[in-house]
Amino acid sequence: NKIEFQKNYGWPKASYGEPYGQKKGQPIFFKEHKKNGFQEPLFAFSKAVGISELIHISNNFSSFWIDNFLISSLWGQSIYRMKFDENFERTIFFEKIYIGQRIRDIKYHNKLNAVLLALEETGEIGIITNK
């Protein structure tokens, strides 16, 4: 979501994800945000993908990726490319890019014009370029 002043997004009481590591007697998540007085998410992964980071990709990276965001994931072992409308009110593009490893971190490197991935299992650095 685009964070707005004095909006309540429900954390930690509301989520479309599933609780894990929950102790007996702890309340479960509210699944309906609006009904419980919380701001609805702009986009939700249902089944959770284990988001590790979200970055805005430089418009210099590719003419096809203008104003795009990349979301790295642990459980999903993928990068998710998203684009929102100009007011950040709806998703207008979504693409899953399968990597095959848990992605611990993702960064855009200006000088290399590349996306760098910290891959968990091998400890390698993945590099995505537009070439």
Describe the predicted segments one by one.
Residues I71, L116-A118:
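Residue position within the beta-strands of beta-propeller blades
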Residues N1-I92, K111, E124, I128-K131:
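Beta-propeller domain segments
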Residues I106, N113-L116, I125-G126:
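C-terminal amphipathic alpha-helical "assembly" element
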